[in-house]
Amino acid sequence: MGQVLTNALLCDLDPPRVETGALRIDAGRIVGRGPTVASQPGDEVVDCGGAVVLPGLVNGHTHVYSALAVGMPPPPKAPQNFLEILKFVWWRLDRALDAEAIELSARIGALEALRCGTTTLIDHHASPSCIKGALDLVQKGIADVGLRGVLCYETTDRHGPDGRAAGIEENRRFLERCSNARDGRISALVGAHASFTLEDEVLEQLATLADDFDTGVHIHVAEDPCDEEDCQHRYQMFLVDRLAAYGLLRPESVFAHCTHLDGLAVAKVNQIGATVAHNPRSNMNNAVGYAPVAAFRCPVMLGTDGIGGDLFAEAKAAWLISRHEQAGLGGPVETSTRAADFSARGDAVRSEPGAAATGLDARAGREAAGGSAPSPLTSVRGSDARGSLVASDALTPTQIVGMLAGGARRASQSLGVTLGKLEAGAAADIVVTDYVPFTPLTSENLPGHILFGLSSNRVRSVLVDGQWRLRDRIVRACDEQAERAHAREAAQRLWQRMAEVPA
């Protein structure tokens, strides 16, 4: 039995296109679109009441393991900079995760996303106390709600050689599982934390793993100035140059944030290619600055970085902060962590207490392996390079909506299905809203309606793979109230374990 959606304002996002019409869905795919479509015997016919119908949204960078962090107690010491936010909050949370919390966080995170019209999650997971099989737990939690996922495990040197090896193996194991399944519902990338917690030999191993599975690397890039500063201080290289030298900069990769890249770094990303995940609400929350997204010519998508699953809110934030920055009101980003601090603290950040530091040389490892050494830092880039990027171009509403659609383009590559399109042959991941515009809605002004008319509160029903996962605001795939009650109990236990983790 298929479905026919009639009397709908069909809204494609990239490029913006609005048509009044109907869709027919069968076997998980859109099979017909037009002013009217013929139903077949047994089809369910749904009158959308003249409301907006959109493709399902894709969260380009998230951490569903943070779902149970909402309302958690403050850390014992107030963070004073980005590194302390990681050390005192998120690295304590991820170490406190057990199997129950991992699966439940994924399920709750997926439920929150579903209610916001998000149908696919590109997730970056970390649980150093429970690594083996962790991605199976995340996948189960997401699948129980009916969403699609592109998953990875965060490889890092923070927990010493054993933790690093376990992270790489979890990525390999899950990549093998996904390559065997190829069902369009789940896929994988190679996960990496960030340059400043990864030694050279690990970058080589990650690139080799990506080569083995013909995929990309999902990594945080220049979220805070400390990432670039650490790279220049320890390796005499610019951050993007280091990632490129070891093969992590590639068209299949996802570079999250890119908040502090200068003009030459942006040009290199544009030239070689990667998909940049822009997370404006997280960047504001962590006070790390504003990414020069207007300068990117490579694909850009929106992510929430674990702040829920509401991409409508993320799009609006992206527009507002771009306006703020265009007016020059953002000001310089202050950080108490300067390059010189890294030599003083050694591997204190890269390796948490009890973990061994590898202390590899930036060039010797590749030379010993018969490869050429990465090019060292040879010149200092102008301090105004990034500033000119921020001020030179203003984003338009159409560009913001293009970023909103960007996650679907990237997820389509990994999953092997067409997402983000209301057209024949595309996956039937569809959001039915109750938004009946009270002003004219056209292809030209659709971005304005998305930014200032639509919101997640207007999401009424959601199809994923042609199945109703949310119908008239009722979750169909699981007992939502029971899951929320379970989550409240599990969150208390998680928070107690966090309190026992040393900062």
Regions found by a protein language model. Give the residues of each.
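N-terminal metal-binding scaffold of metallo-dependent hydrolase/deaminase domains
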Residues: 1-41, 51-52
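C-terminal helical cap
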Residues: 8-10, 106-113, 283-285, 326-342, ...
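Active-site gating loops and adjacent loop-to-helix segments of metal-dependent hydrolytic enzymes
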Residues: 68-102, 131, 146, 159-160, ...
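Alpha-helical scaffold segments that flank or form the walls of functional sites
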Residues: 72-124, 129-147, 171-180, 488-490
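Metal-coordinating catalytic core of metallo-dependent amide/deamination hydrolases
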Residues: 128-259
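Short acidic/histidine-rich active-site segments
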Residues: 217-224, 286-288, 296-317, 422-428
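C-terminal cap of metal-dependent C-N hydrolases
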Residues: 427-484
